[in-house]
Amino acid sequence: MVNPQVIGYIGAAVASLFFGSNYVPVKNYPTGNGLAFTWVMSVGTLVVAYCAMFISKDYIFDPWGLLGGTLWSIGNFCVIPIVKTIGIGLGLLLWCCSSIITGYFTGKFGWFGIDKQKVSHPALNWIGFACIVAAVIFFFFIEPTIEEKDEHSYSSIVDDSEIGNNGIDNNGYNSINNNNNNGNNKRRSGAFNKQPKKSIFERMPPPYNTILGIVLSVFSGIMYGVNMVPMQLWKQSNVDASPLSFVFCHFSGIFLANTAVFIVYSIIVRPPQIFPQTIFPSFFSGLLWGIANVGLMVATQNLGYTIGFPMGSGGPMIVSSLWSVFYFREIQGVKNLLILLISFIFLGAGITILALSH
């Protein structure tokens, strides 16, 4: 029989590889306000759940699993206002830190009813955890070279700027008979490539927008950090059960939460913003994310929250950074590469020390 620790380390490696790569398919495609993207992505995760159910030949459908998936989705919904208020750089730093800290402390101190995890070398465990947090902080000082993509050069199924213009009547439906030819000519001429109205988050004055962004980032990280708690509680009552048995209900929670939000959004915003060319990349991104989360679930169950979760959550930063350096060329210059190297050293040391502390 394979050692559970070995399985846990393999799970952490899978999580690191696929979490670090799951947004690569949509990198060069428009995502708009992100709601359609996250819903299609959740469909991809559900496909992974069915595959896991087929492999394990056993599954449960526990309300606690739905809760776990919903907690993750709540954290993910915060990403849109975070990016609008404080940007992806600071936001990513804050939610990564709060996620790793929350997950580590949850297992270390037995929060939310989880059994406290005991390790052979507590001092090494703390040092490894501190190294991973330090690595995340170092990542913040990297200044990427990012070429902004103009999402208005893409055509959504119905552009936001069409709302209220000719072609959309007062009830929000397409007045095809009256303005079809007019609308087609405007679309071909680029008349609909107007700047959409700024969101409520972008209109907030400083420092309120910054405060909101920071609060949402920390909250989002906490949701990411506790989304595995229901699975851990279930595992404590089903010691011999496979983590693959829990995947379906957990991912169903993600799918149902995203579906509910997208339906409400589609009712309120008529018509919703959907980019056809982004649908398949979003679905593929969901497949990669689903595989990654299965790896994290395996790592967390076999290594515990204080080891498996930080390893599976910190490792993706290495992979995503390598994509940025060698493929997208976003991280350039001696200074940035030196900071990245220091981050890698701290992250690698932290993961290694965590493994040794077990």
UniProtKB/Swiss-Prot annotation:
Topology class, membrane? Multi-pass membrane protein
Q: Which UniProt keywords apply?
A: Membrane, Transmembrane, Transmembrane helix
Q: Name one GO cellular component term.
A: membrane
Q: Which Pfam family is one of this chain's hits? A: TMEM144
Q: Where in the cell is it found?
A: Membrane
Cited InterPro entries: Sugar_transport, TMEM144
Q: Which residues cross the membrane?
A: 6-26, 35-55, 60-79, 86-108, 122-142, 211-231, 244-264, 279-299, 307-327, 337-357
State the source organism's domain of life. Answer: Eukaryota
Gene Ontology molecular function terms on file: carbohydrate transmembrane transporter activity
Please report which protein family the annotation says this sequence is part of. Answer: Belongs to the TMEM144 family.
Q: What is this protein called?
A: Transmembrane protein 144 homolog B
Q: Give the organism, scientific name.
A: Dictyostelium discoideum
Q: What is the lineage of its organism?
A: Eukaryota, Amoebozoa, Evosea, Eumycetozoa, Dictyostelia
